[in-house]
Design a protein with these regions (language model features):
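Short alpha-helical donor nucleotide-sugar binding micro-motif in glycosyltransferases
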Residues: 277-278, 285-290
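Short His-centered aromatic/hydrophobic patch
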Residues: 111-117
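Short hydrophobic beta-strand element within catalytic cores of glycosyltransferases
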Residues: 314-318
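A short, well-ordered alpha-helix in the C-terminal region of glycosyltransferases
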Residues: 244, 357-371
Length: 396
């Protein structure tokens, strides 16, 4: 692992942008792919599209200067602090961040993870600089350590991606809901579009003539809340009405052997196809294989539902999680008890019959893009940034 010296980041002699509007502090954006990283990239993509020019400094604890960064811009300056010693990297970032705050006095600091909230609070509060903590999901659903909870409750604002995540975080950590604001995920309508099923993929997965249910999920034994096992248990009932049904599971992980054994024990192993890992750029063609996207899970939000809907694929989710937002409380999809195979089976049969408006490909895509497309996301982000300037110390 390459050690990044302080001199490659923000040296004491360097000048920072005196007109800096915002400072963003994240663990990482480019070192790993995931929901949080994708969400942050959407924020920067929208940030650079604003007609009003903002300038920002971005501090990345675990990313290195050789990261492939498409957001480098004169108005978006990045500082990298990946280091062989995590302690030294954090120390370097803290020193550089303090220097930036002292010199540029930004309007608002955005802390991108609860693990950085104590550092941001420690530096911002004595200087009277308001800070916002961005939360994504499970990292704030349980009671936090005292210092982290204090940093969160002391924030001027908290952003989160769904009402469910807001409610879980507030309940677990005694937060005032008034300072928690919704900043939902976005979907790129140009990247995910409807289209024909590719013959090559149909042949590859043995889906000729099949009604295809699909799930995209990590198959980790410590993270079984995606509901793949529940969908497998529902297959025998679905097959009674649709004998041609098959279930395509995209994703990898150590829980696959258990799921494969479950399918075998239920006599549906010939109906379950484990595709393994599929690269992001190939996902759209796989969504197009599906007649229904099925994930009766417990999500903080569920970007995969938006991806499926943008491809015109009807969706099913659990009924007690953050999917209420992308599915608009059931207006755009089916919501069922997430551990009930019977409920999943009944909903899947309705979806495959295709009579419901929520199965209308064009209508479904239209609704998803209007509410969660990049343009809507950009407008919402700009409104949030403006409100942080007008009322930086929102009432607690």
């Amino acid at each position: 692992m390459r050690i990044t010296p302080v001199t490659e980041n923000l040296k004491l002699g360097d000048k920072v942008n005196k007109k800096t509007n915002h400072v963003f502090v994240f663990l990482e954006i480019f070192a790993h792919e995931g929901g949080i990283q994708s969400y942050i990239k959407d924020i920067f993509r929208a940030y650079l599209r604003f007609s009003q020019v903002y300038k920002a400094e971005v501090f990345l604890l675990r990313d290195s200067p050789d990261s492939l960064n498409p957001f480098e811009d004169e108005n978006l300056k990045f500082h990298y602090f990946k280091n062989q010693s995590p302690y030294l990297g954090r120390l370097q970032m803290a020193a550089a961040l303090l220097k930036c705050l002292l010199q540029s006095r930004p309007q608002q600091v955005f802390c991108g993870h609860i693990n950085l909230a104590v550092l941001v609070q420690t530096l911002c509060q004595p200087l009277g600089i308001p800070y916002t903590v961005l939360t994504y999901g499970k990292e704030v659903w349980e009671p936090l350590k005292n210092q982290e909870r204090h940093a969160l409750t002391s924030a001027n604002r908290i952003w989160t991606i769904s009402r469910y995540s807001r409610d879980r975080a507030c309940l677990a950590n005694a937060l005032n809901p008034k300072i928690v604001e919704m900043m939902p995920c976005a979907i790129d309508g140009d990247k995910f579009t409807p289209g024909c099923k590719q013959p090559e993929l149909i042949q590859k997965y043995g889906l000729t003539g099949a009604k295809v249910l699909m799930t995209v999920a990590r198959l980790w034994s410590g993270d079984i809340y995606k509901g793949v096992d529940v969908t497998i248990r529902a297959l025998p009932q679905i097959a009674q009405v649709f004998p041609e049904v098959k279930y395509l599971v995209i994703g990898r992980g150590d829980d696959q052997p258990r799921l494969a054994k479950l399918a075998k024990n239920l006599g549906v192993s010939d109906r379950v196809m484990f595709a393994g890992f599929v690269a992001t750029e190939e996902l759209m063609e796989h969504y197009r294989l599906a007649d229904a996207y099925i994930m009766p899970s417990q999500e903080g939000f569920g970007i995969v539902y938006l991806e499926a809907m943008a491809c015109g694929v009807p969706v099913l989710s659990g009924d007690d999680d953050g999917s209420a937002d992308p599915l608009q409380d059931g207006k755009l999809g089916w919501r069922v008890p997430h551990r009930s195979p019977d409920a999943v089976a009944a909903a899947c049969i309705e979806m495959l019959q295709g009579d419901d408006q929520r199965c209308d490909q064009e209508w479904l895509r239209e609704q998803a893009i209007a509410l969660f497309g990049i343009d809507a996301f950009q407008q919402h982000l700009q409104k949030m940034l403006l409100s942080s300037v007008i009322d930086p110390f929102k009432s607690k």
